Amino acid sequence: MAWALLLLTLLTQGTGSWAQSALTQPPFVSGAPGQSVTISCTGTSSDVGDYDHVFWYQKRLSTTSRLLIYNVNTRPSGISDLFSGSKSGNMASLTISGLKSEVEANYHCSLYSSSYTF
């Protein structure tokens, strides 16, 4: 039986002390098991383009947000190498390789760490 794994993304607006920017993500992306998908996060030259402080979070039902990537492409200890981050110009991306059912979740980008207010 063929099935598609749905990965939901959120629109995120950061509001903090050093930037007030609207970051744009697609409403959803999907892929089949084993495939790779990339979620984009588009900003401007004065936010994503200027800074390497892009963070990616995963939010599953009934759990708190989990930091997947910080400073564009760095994974915290314990985060699977299925997740990778990159940036080109005003767009940051999160790539999830080898899709599995356990990565079905909400994903969002931010210019802030979880210690800031979103």
Curated annotation (Swiss-Prot):
GO terms for biological process: adaptive immune response; immune response. PROSITE patterns: IG_LIKE. Disulfide bonds join C41-C109. Keywords: Adaptive immunity, Cell membrane, Disulfide bond, Immunity, Immunoglobulin, Immunoglobulin domain, Membrane, Secreted, Signal. Residues 34-118 form the Ig-like domain. The keyword Cell membrane applies. Residues 45-53 are annotated as: Complementarity-determining-1. One of its GO terms (cellular component) is immunoglobulin complex. SUPFAM superfamilies: Immunoglobulin. Immunoglobulins are composed of two identical heavy chains and two identical light chains; disulfide-linked. PANTHER family: IMMUNOGLOBULIN LIGHT CHAIN. This is Probable non-functional immunoglobulin lambda variable 2-33. It comes from Homo sapiens. The gene is IGLV2-33.
